[in-house]
Amino acid sequence: MRKVYLSIALGFCCQGILAQQSFYRWKVEAEAGVSCSVLDTDVSGLSETYYKVRPGFTAAIGAEYNIVDQLAVGAGIRFVQRDYLYQNLGGDSWNTRYNNNFISIPLHLGYYLLHNPYHEKGLWIKPQVGIYYEYFTSMHTKGMYPMNIMEGYKGDGSYIRYNTTYDFRKNENHLRRSLFGGEAGIKIGYSFGKIDASVGYQFQYGFSHIYQEKASTSKTARRNSSLITASAAYKF
């Protein structure tokens, strides 16, 4: 009789343990952070000319699905500022600050290490790779040029100062608005059950040339960015 009672007790314990182990398939996530971008182009023929990194803001919402074991696929929508500084430090030095805003749709594939947050609590690490499509929504430029290279502006001393928003309807510089790129990164997080918290790093490399084919330049020019983010997620 004691063996029967013991078997029943063990059965209830096992059921209790299984009830506590929740298995999820989906995750919805919100994240925000800092972007650091630069224009990747050849300026070797221009003396003392540089493109420098400037910080911006990024935010995203997305969903992820646990395909099998530790493998997951995700997609979402992201806002990212790809800002950078152009400087010419020659005899007549000048600079331009570029504030570029994009809306992107990323698609990524990730693999969880240490713990699988869809099955268990604890610390996890997720390397991931993916691609993205993005749309160039707006560009704002601010800076100054030497007066002797431009006409039609009222200058302050020997320099012309300006602060303008680019008109994409005219698109005089023949900029592309639809672009593609690839990304790779890593996230480190902790699963509390239904809730995850994490920090991450991503490097984004632009596949698309920023100019249209009819543009007068033959130089390769792409925008590359590093994103550092913090995020929270809910699983179901």
Predicted region positions:
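Hydrophobic, well-structured mid-protein blocks that either form specific transmembrane helices
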Residues: R97-M139, G143
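Extended, basic/helix-rich recognition subdomains
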Residues: G189-Q212
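Bacterial Sec-dependent N-terminal signal peptides
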Residues: M1-K27, I228, A232-F236
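Extracellular/periplasm-exposed beta-strand and loop segments of Gram-negative cell-envelope proteins
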Residues: V38-R54, Q81-I103, Y135-L179, F207-T229
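N-terminal hydrophobic signal/anchor transmembrane helix of membrane proteins
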Residues: E64-N66, Q70-V73, F79-L85
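Residues on the lipid-exposed face of transmembrane beta-strands in outer-membrane beta-barrel proteins
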Residues: A30-V34, F57-Y65, I77-F79, I105-Y111, ...
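Short loop/turn motifs that connect adjacent beta-strands in outer-membrane beta-barrel proteins
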Residues: Q20-R25, D69-Q70, L114-W124, H140, ...
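Short glycine/proline- and aromatic-enriched beta-strand/turn motifs that initiate or cap beta-hairpins
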Residues: Q20-A60
